[in-house]
From Swiss-Prot:
Top-level taxon of origin: Bacteria
UniProt source species: Serratia proteamaculans (strain 568)
Protein name stated in the entry: Probable transcriptional regulatory protein Spro_2779
Signal peptide stretch: none
GO BP annotation list: regulation of DNA-templated transcription
Amino acid sequence: MAGHSKWANTKHRKAAQDSKRGKIFTKIIRELVTAAKLGGGDPGANPRLRAAIDKALSNNMTRDTLNRAIARGVGGDDDSNMETIIYEGYGPGGTAVMIECLSDNRNRTVAEVRHAFTKCGGNLGTDGSVAYLFTKKGVITYAPGLDEDVVMEAALEAGAEDIVSYDDGVIDVFTAWENLGEVKDALTAAGFTADSAEVSMIPSTKADMDEETAPKLLRLIDMLEDCDDVQEVYHNGEISDEVAATL
C-alpha cells in the first residue's frame, strides 16, 4: 500500500496544530461522549470508542478527562443530539476532500463547510463524489528508530494488513479500522510503543500540489479544522518536500 500524505506532508503545520490543542481536545471529548452514548462504554465491544480513546491518548489527554467524557455518554448526562455527517468536495488543484463532522445542526455545519470551500477555490460536492477514492483504515504510526523488518513481522502476526516506511524512518502500520485497538495492543505487548493510533480515510490516488495550489489547500484544511463541528479532514493532496520548503 502506498503511504498517504496526512502525516508526512503536514509536518510543517505542526506548530499551527499545537496552537489548536484546546479545540482538538474539545472535538475529541465530543467524539468520546457520542461513541459511548451510541455504543456503550466498553472499548472492547465498541470499536468507535476504542479508536476515540487511542486518539485521545495520542494527543496526551489525561485518563481522568477521557473517563469523564465516557461516563457522560454512558450515563446519559449529555442531552445534545449529535449526528455524524460526512461532506465531500474538491479542493485546490483538483484534490479530493472528505470532511467528517459531529453536529446538532446540519444547516449551520454545511454553511460553514461550504464557506471554507468557496473562500479557498474549491467546491462542495454531492454524496459519493469523492468517497470512492478513500478507504477507512486504522493507522498506527511509529517514530523513527525501529527496525522495519522486525515491526513488519510483529504487525502481520498481530493481524495488520500492511506496513509502510518513509524516508525519514517513520513507520505506518495499516489495519482494518475495527481492529485498530487489538493490533496496537499486540504491538505494544511486543515492545513497540506507538506515536499515534487513529482511524483514517486513506486515498487510493494522489493529487500533486505545486507552489500555487499547496498554500490554498493548507488554508482550506485550516479553515475546515477551525469549524467547531468538523472532527476530521481527509484529502489526497501530495506536497513534495521541495514545495513544502517554500511554504
